[in-house]
Regions:
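Short basic helix-loop element that most often maps to the first helix and adjoining turn
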Residues: 13-32, 57
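A detector for short, charged/polar N-terminal pre-domain segments
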Residues: 1-10
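Conserved hydrophobic/aromatic packing and binding residues within compact polymer-binding modules
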Residues: 15, 29-30, 40-43, 69
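Short amphipathic helical patch at the helix-1/turn junction of helix-turn-helix
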Residues: 9, 20-21, 49
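DNA major-groove recognition helix of helix-turn-helix/homeodomain DNA-binding modules
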Residues: 54-68
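Recognition helix of helix-turn-helix/homeodomain-like DNA-binding domains
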Residues: 35-48
């Protein structure tokens, strides 16, 4: 883990990378997750401390395990 980034920033960068690999906009991704687009943006910028329920929703939408979200 890089010392100069917070866990939220690392997680957000990982989510953004995986979303872009799917070719999804933030709006499409938010719809797939059942979350709001501005919330997804805040996650990707590392501004939110994401709940376990929302982590699960993100992993499910991306069709990956929760563990894979933390492979940064």
């Amino acid at each position: 883990m890089r010392k100069n980034k917070t866990v939220q920033q690392l997680f957000g960068s990982r989510v953004r990378k995986l979303r872009k690999l799917k070719g999804w906009s933030q709006e499409r991704f938010a719809d797939e997750c059942g979350l709001h687009r501005t919330y997804i943006g805040a996650i990707e910028r590392g501004e939110r401390n994401v709940s376990l329920n929302n982590i699960h929703a993100i992993a499910k939408a991306l069709d990956i395990s929760v563990k894979e979200l933390f492979d940064y």
